[in-house]
Amino acid sequence: MKGLTLACIAATVVAASHAMTTIIAPIAEISTTSSPSTTTINPLLQSRIDFEISRLTRRLERRIRGLQVGSGRLDRSITSLQRELDFNNAVLAQLPELIKNIMINNPTQRLSSRTVASIMRSVQNAATKASNEESAEVEDRRRRAIFEVTSSIVIVEGTTDSTTTTQIPEVTTQEVDTTTEMVTTAAPEQEVTSTATETTTEMTTQGTTLPSFLVSRINSVVSRIGRFFQRRIQRIQRSLSRLSRFRPLYSRLIDENTSALNNLPLLVRGLVTSPFQRRLRLSQVFRALRFRLTITTPSQPDVSPMSVRKRRQAESAEEDDDLVGDMEDLKELEQEIQEALEEVEKLDV
């Protein structure tokens, strides 16, 4: 009886041991593959992260290119406006003399602002052309002198050794008095009255006194066209002031988008917590960058995507667009720039 009991106990122990072995083995395998030293990201999550990085990279690159194009167009517009402002200031400064010279030859001609501007541009173009021709002539003389000096250098090859000697003839320079006597003739003083009602003031040109009716007409034309150019200058200055305010904004947006592009992989890894979550918006990436969130890789123990998400939602729960900071106003900004440019185009007389 005792032998039978011992046999039953032994069989029970063997069966229990076999059952424990079949249960413990898979657990041992699981614990081995999931040890902290060999933890790997879920392939689905990694694929989603790579997809978001690729998609947002393309969007950021397009946005940066668009901002750079807009910034370049803004700079060209400001340069063009500044050049136009300088021209109109020059016209306004020389307007009395210009009107007087025109009306002396054509007293009955009715002058318009377009005619005056066209004449002034012709004068400036002629002066620029003369200056360019003078510069080209000076450069041509310099090159000719260099050629004459270098062409007189004689190279003599030695016959006793392999050395080559260069003989440069002595160049003597003679001081030549290049001072040009300039004879200036003092032009008679020319006075233009500031109002059209003063007919007693005399205007002279080359010693000849102009009739009072011509003086009055000249003053009237100067006053009329001068007011037009003054209004034109004020409008250009207002447009310049409006456009100049956009320069730092464009620069800041380009810097912010470039920074987001450079840090995009790290930001996406911290924001993508599930392979099945909604697509990331650029606003989420920019908020993480703007608030200096510490986003690390998921394999490190200090990552807390839930706290990041809660903080992001607390900062801006209602913001649901793809804009960052002042990017919400980018369309309004571009519209304002377009209005300023259209206003400048209307300045053409």
From Swiss-Prot:
- Gene Ontology cellular component annotations, sorted alphabetically: extracellular region
Primary location class: secreted
Annotated coiled-coil positions are 316-349
Q: Report residue spans for region: Disordered.
A: 300-326
Provide the residues annotated with a glycan attachment (glycosylation): N257
Locations listed in the record = Secreted
Please state the span of the N-terminal signal peptide per the UniProt entry.
Answer: 1-19
Top-level division of the source organism's lineage? Eukaryota
Quote the biased-composition stretches of kind Acidic residues, using this chain's numbering: 316-326
Identify the keywords attached in UniProt to this record, alphabetized: Coiled coil, Glycoprotein, Secreted, Signal
Query: What is this protein's record name?
Result: Threonine-rich protein
Q: In which tissues is it expressed?
A: Component of the acid-insoluble and acid-soluble organic matrix of calcified layers of the shell (at protein level).
